[in-house]
Design a protein with these regions (language model features):
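Nucleotide-activated chemistry modules centered on ATP-dependent adenylation/adenylyltransferase
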Residues: 1-191
Length: 191
């Protein structure tokens, strides 16, 4: 098995990438670095769920740096500009994951962000490719989005905590607005 450092945003989004990467001959080590997740209780809840799942699955977990001040200074000011905000957020988190991968002697690096249909897939991959190359790492980029329904099913079956927004306060507002819009559309369709 080839060791791979896999940045993880949460336990549910890790399920299918870990399974599929193992089938390809990789042995993922999970790397948690998510200073974007707010509020602090939400950050703790997601990390605790990931810790539990990794322990149950005998998966190594590295808890890396959490530079919240840097996130607030470099990402938060982009606020409502989702494409720029997400690109900056991916860059901050994946730069830390690549730093850890290089320091720990990994050749391969990837991210579970590629499982969610709500992420900016191409942007995330562009950022990962650039940062991995700068550190002499090989990015492992896979489109896990077709497996999102299975990840959802499995996470519910396992009783995992499932969040309903990406992590930052801006995504929480955007997700709430999307849910309200969908609810309104369903009500209108029933009339």
């Amino acid at each position: 098995m080839r060791p791979l450092l896999l940045h993880a945003c949460c336990a549910p989004c890790s399920l299918e990438p870990v399974r599929l990467l193992r089938e390809e001959g990789f042995e993922p080590t999970i790397c948690w670095t998510n200073p974007n997740i707010q509020p602090r209780d939400e950050w703790r809840r997601r990390l605790d769920e990931l810790r539990r799942w990794c322990a149950d699955g005998d998966i190594e977990l590295i808890e890396a740096g959490e530079d919240r001040e840097r996130w607030e200074a470099g990402v938060a000011p982009l606020g409502a500009d989702r494409p720029r905000r997400c690109r900056s957020c991916y860059a901050l988190r994946l730069a830390e994951a690549c730093r850890v991968a290089q320091e720990r002697g990994f050749e391969f690096v990837g991210t579970t962000l590629a499982v969610s249909p709500y992420q900016l897939f191409d942007t995330c991959n562009d950022v990962l490719e650039r940062l991995a190359a700068a550190r002499g790492l090989t990015p492992v980029i896979r489109d896990f989005r077709p497996y999102y329904p299975e990840a959802t099913r499995r996470s519910r079956e396992l009783g995992m905590y499932r969040q309903n927004y990406c992590g930052c306060r801006f995504s929480a507002v955007e997700a709430a607005m999307d849910r309200a819009r969908i609810r309104d559309e369903r009500k209108a369709a029933k009339k």
